[in-house]
C-alpha cells in the first residue's frame, strides 16, 4: 500500500473512532455536529480515493491498461462504500439537527 493511502486510511480510522461516539451521544446539537463531521470525513476521504494518484509501476509495461483498470476499480469500490457511509451519517444528522434549538444546524446535514 502506498504511503499516502496508508496515511489516508489511518486518518479516517482515527476520525471515525473519535467522531462515532459523538454522533451517537449527547445533546441533539452535539449529535448533529458529530454526525456532520463524520460524514465530512468519509466523503472527503472518498473524494481523495477517487482522485488518487495511479502508481507509476502500474502505468508502464505490457499489461498496464489492465493493471490501471483493476487498481482504479478497487479504489472506486472503496470510495463508493465511503460515500454510502457518509450519506448515512448525513441522514442520521438531520433528525438531531432538527431537534436542536438552533435552526442553522440543519445546514450541517445538507448533502
Task: Cite the ranges covered by each PLM segment.
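Acidic, polar-rich low-complexity tracts and alpha-helical solenoid repeat scaffolds
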Residues: 1-111
Amino acid at each position: 500500500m502506498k504511503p499516502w493511502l496508508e496515511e489516508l486510511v489511518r486518518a479516517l480510522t482515527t476520525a471515525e473512532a473519535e467522531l462515532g461516539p459523538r454522533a451517537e451521544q449527547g445533546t441533539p446539537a452535539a449529535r448533529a455536529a458529530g454526525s456532520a463531521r463524520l460524514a465530512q470525513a468519509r466523503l472527503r476521504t472518498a473524494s481523495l480515493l477517487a482522485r488518487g494518484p495511479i502508481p507509476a509501476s502500474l502505468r508502464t509495461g505490457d499489461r498496464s491498461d489492465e493493471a490501471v483498470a483493476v487498481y482504479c476499480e478497487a479504489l472506486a469500490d472503496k470510495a463508493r462504500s465511503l460515500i454510502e457511509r457518509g450519506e448515512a451519517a448525513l441522514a442520521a444528522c438531520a433528525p438531531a439537527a432538527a431537534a436542536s434549538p438552533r435552526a442553522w444546524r440543519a445546514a450541517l446535514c445538507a448533502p
